[in-house]
Amino acid sequence: MATVTAALVKELRERTGAGMMECKKALVEANADIELAIENMRKSGAAKAAKKAGNVAAEGAIIIKEENGSAVLLEVNCQTDFVAKDGNFTAFAQEVAAAALASKATVEELQAQFEEARVALVAKIGENINIRRVQYVEGTAIASYRHGEKIGVVVAGEGDAETLKHVAMHVAASKPEYVNPEDVPADVVAKEKEVQVEIAMNEGKPAEIAEKMVVGRMKKFTGEISLTGQAFIMEPKKTVGEMLKEKGASVATFVRLEVGEGIEKAEGLSFAEEVALAQKG
C-alpha cells in the first residue's frame, strides 16, 4: 500500500480547500493516488451539497458590477452571515457577477453554468449556497450604491454622477416601489382608494368632505411609494423630484435588491441552533 505523506496531504488541501483530516482520509481510501482522491472528494462533495440543499439560505451578499452603460445586480445566498463574509464565498459571488455582466445570462443559465463550482463550495464551507436573483440595468448615466453587503441599488437616468449616487443612496434607505406617482398601477390605486373611502365613511364625515379627504390621502399614498414623490433623505424639505429638477437631472429606472427578501426562515430556531444544525449536516 502506498504511503500517504504530509506533502501529499498539503497538495490535496491546496487543490481542494478541504480540511486536513478529510484530505488524509481521501488519500488513504485512494491508496495515495491524488487524482483519484480529488475525483472521490468531488463525488462526496456533490452528495454533501445535496444534503445541504434543504437548508434555508437567507443570508448572503448583493454584488454590483458596471461597465459601459450596463450594470448587473446579483444576489447569492448562504445560511449564515459568517459565511457571507468568507473569502471563498465572496470570490464565487464576484465570479458569477462578472460572468453575468459579460453575457446578460438569466439566473437559470447562471445556475447551470456555475453548478459544479457551487457544489464544490458547499462541500468546502458546509453551507447551502444559492444563486438567487440577477437583474440588469442599462442607461446613458448609471450610478450604484451598496449598503454593506446586504442592499444594492442601481439608478439609470440623466444627470451628474454625484446626484444620481445620492438618489441611489435614497432608494437604499427609503425603498420606493415606482419612479413617479403616475407610475403606480391602476389596480394598486383602486385598492387603496377603497380602503380610504371606507375609513372616511367610518369617521362619519359628510360625503363632500370625505371625498376631499380621500383625494388628499391618495395623493399622499402615491407620493410615499414613488421615488420622485418621497421626501429626499438628504434634504427632507424637498421631494426627490424637486431636487432632481433643481439639478437638471432625471431618473428613468432603478433596481433595489436586499439580501433575503421574501425568504422565510425556519420558525422556532435560534441563530445558534441553525449553526448547530448546519455543523451536523
Curated annotation (Swiss-Prot):
Region (Involved in Mg(2+) ion dislocation from EF-Tu): 80-83
InterPro entries in UniProt: EF-Ts_dimer_sf, Transl_elong_EFTs/EF1B, Transl_elong_EFTs/EF1B_dimer, Transl_elong_Ts_CS, UBA-like_sf
Cellular component GO terms, alphabetical: cytoplasm
Gene Ontology MF terms in the entry: translation elongation factor activity
Keyword line: Cytoplasm, Elongation factor, Protein biosynthesis
Gene3D superfamilies in alphabetical order: 1.10.286.20, DNA helicase RuvA subunit, C-terminal domain, Elongation factor Ts, dimerisation domain
Source taxon at top rank: Bacteria
Compartments, record wording: Cytoplasm
Keyword set includes Protein biosynthesis: yes
HAMAP family: EF_Ts
General function of this protein: Associates with the EF-Tu.GDP complex and induces the exchange of GDP to GTP. It remains bound to the aminoacyl-tRNA.EF-Tu.GTP complex up to the GTP hydrolysis stage on the ribosome.
Family statement drawn from the similarity comment of this UniProt entry: Belongs to the EF-Ts family.
Protein name: Elongation factor Ts
Protein encoded by which gene: tsf
